[in-house]
């Protein structure tokens, strides 16, 4: 790996981890500031995972306050466990790593039913899979959490990219939608900009 790229990656990961640790539960990037609209209202991205799998995983990993508040023990977020569970249910997580080709195979019915997203989904899955593989190399020495963050990062990457490049015939020209694109480009997670209780997979 190029030493410059490696060094940049390490710096990025360290800074990101410091932000997360130093500001637990805070909206560091201002993702919710001045936002009155949700991503659901701007681009109707199809549900990629089976609804039964999603509901089963949400029931198995409910959102609740962490038991450890003394910064001891493994760190984790229920969203990471839900995402990991969903990816396993889709057969897209093998040996604790995201399997891009398996994910693409699992969403084939969705691709066929949504031709507007077909080409975009192919490119997005490949791009996000490659990105997650690089990030995993940089973070593999971090203290092991309850659930790996790779699955959650991959799903957020896929949906975030689909939103940023939403097909014109699906995109809704509403005030605030372009602002949401800018927020995602800045680093806000797609699922952090969704409505609560939505019908699609929600790992954050």
Swiss-Prot record:
Disulfide bonds join 57-85, 81-147, 128-157. Coiled coil: none annotated. The keyword Secreted applies. Transmembrane segments: none annotated. Residues 1-22 form the signal peptide. Its main location: secreted. It comes from the Eukaryota. GO terms for biological process: sensory perception of smell. GO terms for molecular function: odorant binding. SUPFAM superfamilies: Insect pheromone/odorant-binding proteins (SSF47565). GO terms for cellular component: extracellular region. Keywords: Disulfide bond, Olfaction, Secreted, Sensory transduction, Signal, Transport. It is found in: Secreted. Present in the aqueous fluid surrounding olfactory sensory dendrites and are thought to aid in the capture and transport of hydrophobic odorants into and through this fluid. Belongs to the PBP/GOBP family. PANTHER family: IP02236P, ODORANT-BINDING PROTEIN 59A-RELATED. This is General odorant-binding protein 67. It comes from Anopheles gambiae.
């Amino acid at each position: 790996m190029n030493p410059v790229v490696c060094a940049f990656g390490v710096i990025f990961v360290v800074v990101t981890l410091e932000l997360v640790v130093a500001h637990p539960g805070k909206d560091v990037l201002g993702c919710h500031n001045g936002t009155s609209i949700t991503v659901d209202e701007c681009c109707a991205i199809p549900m990629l995972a089976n609804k039964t799998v999603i509901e089963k995983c949400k029931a198995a990993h409910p959102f609740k306050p962490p038991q450890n508040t003394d910064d001891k023990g493994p760190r984790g977020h229920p969203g990471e466990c839900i995402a990991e569970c969903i990816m396993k249910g889709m057969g897209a997580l093998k040996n604790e790593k995201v399997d891009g080709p398996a994910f693409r195979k699992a969403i084939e019915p969705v691709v066929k039913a949504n031709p507007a997203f077909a080409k975009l989904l192919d490119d997005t899955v490949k791009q996000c899979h490659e990105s997650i593989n690089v990030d995993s190399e940089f973070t593999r020495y971090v203290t092991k959490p309850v659930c790996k963050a790779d699955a959650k990062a991959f799903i957020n990457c896929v949906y975030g990219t689909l939103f940023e490049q939403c097909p014109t015939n699906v995109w809704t020209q509403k005030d605030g939608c372009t602002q949401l694109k800018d927020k995602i480009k800045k680093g806000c997670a797609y699922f952090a900009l969704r409505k609560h209780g939505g019908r699609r997979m929600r790992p954050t």
